[in-house]
Amino acid sequence: MSLDQTVDQVLRWAFKSEPLGHAVHFANAYTIALASQDADYAEAINSGDLVCCDGTPVVWAGKWLPDPHGSEWQRVYGPDVMTAVLEKSTARHKHYLLGSTTDTLNLLRNKILQNYPNAKVVGMDSPPFRNATEQELSERNERIADSGANIVWVGLGTPKQDFEVERLKACLPVTALAVGAAFDFLAGTVPQAPPWMQKSGTEWLYRWSKEPKRLTKRYLWGNPTFVKLVVQQRLADRRKATQN
């Protein structure tokens, strides 16, 4: 799906009167590398109602590997989706912000009110870094339900945010999106890479230079693991084609 198609789908889901919600994931090199070694995480991603190509290298890999379905690989970047959904929101779209710090959430809410006047933020929650207890999760569900939200933006970091959007869709009639760093980018607390770096697949270098402590493991382990997985899949596809 293209960016526009993804945005339209999210906006439509918000109005569906169904008992269960929808989950949207954004797959990048680290996501795929992590899923290859964590079966529970892989199941969470695969259970998503929509999984978008968040990273340019993922798009390249999709185009390089044989695809019997003839898919059209496009980058659908989490921050771009969040921005576009906010821009196209009406009074009926009610947004809830889950994740990050209280300061960042306050900045983000103010930016949304300033830049997207039609987007209504009905609640926000900055949970503790540790895993939430069952009681805390139940109380979180109640807060979201009481707010009337139909779109929940989740920025808890990978992999926690992907598990959370799956949990939310099973509990509430909301569309939950695991958008990660979009909170920081839109709030202005972390600078975003220039467009040319995003298109060239070098955005990770920019982000690493800005947050080396947090992102070193992600890139030093995740990127090589992703490349290894792609090459292994390519070789396996070639062997299969030769045998046939």
Walk through the language-model features, giving the residues of each:
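A transmembrane-helix-recognition feature enriched in membrane-embedded lipid enzymes
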Residues: V59-W60, A193-N244
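Conserved acidic residues
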Residues: D49, V122, N150, V174
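Short gly/pro/ser/thr-enriched loop/turn and capping motifs at secondary-structure boundaries
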Residues: V58-W60, K160, A182-A187
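Proline-aspartate-enriched helix->loop->beta-strand connector
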Residues: I144, G148-T158
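A short, gly/pro- and small-residue-rich
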Residues: A39, E43-S47, D162-A181
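N-terminal nucleotide/polyanion-binding subdomain common to many enzyme families
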Residues: M1-V76
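Conserved beta-alpha
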Residues: G62-E139, S147
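Short, flexible loop segments at boundaries between secondary-structure elements
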Residues: S126-T133, V174-K210
